[in-house]
Amino acid sequence: MLPVWSAMVLFAAVQEQMFSTFVEQGTAMERHIGSFEIPAASFQCVDTIAVIMLVPVYERVLVPVFRRFTGRPNGITTPQRIGIGLFFSMSAMVSAALVESSRLQIAQAEGLVHRKVAVPMSILWQGPQYFLLGVAEVFSNVGLTEFFYDESPDAMRSLCMAFSLLNVSAGNYLSSFILSLMPVFTAGGGSPGWIPDNLNEGHLDRFYLMMAGLSLLNIFIFAFCAMRYKCKKAS
């Protein structure tokens, strides 16, 4: 069970970007719709809306479809559900990298690279990356909870369920650690680094691509462990 839990630590680190680098990215984008200014942090509601919308869709639509092909009551196994969530998590990082790459190109074209100002690119372009993280939550977070409930010994079920939530804290620490390393390894020699105070001078897109690469590696490791894991109960 520990390898499955470990895979979710990086997943939680990716999810944490929604509260840190996504907000910074949004602050450096055009946030006005008419006279109304969208707070950059408020876009986290897209993730919440995605979860609210997709949980019933998964249970009422996807599970019956999966069940036809697999013959399993829950459609797919919990490791498979977690794996799908890990894939969408990686996709969110790729989406964020594409948005940031476009934002930097616009900053270059408008001569805003050395000015700490918002770039004329709508914050609405961030929508897909938040939505993809919501999809990832529906699959991986719920899948992890089901996995620990089904696979833990009866006498340790409460402890294992609590342990399953520890990945969120571990992921936040991992994210903070990775971000703290960015100035060390990416700044210097006249370069402001990937994530400077002025994002127009940085390369936040490279950070997102790095997280996507780590997520892809995480998927392969998780798949290797999951294929060798024998479920205690039919999922």
Where are these regions (language model features)?
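Hydrophobic transmembrane alpha-helices of multi-pass solute transporters/permeases
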Residues: 1-235
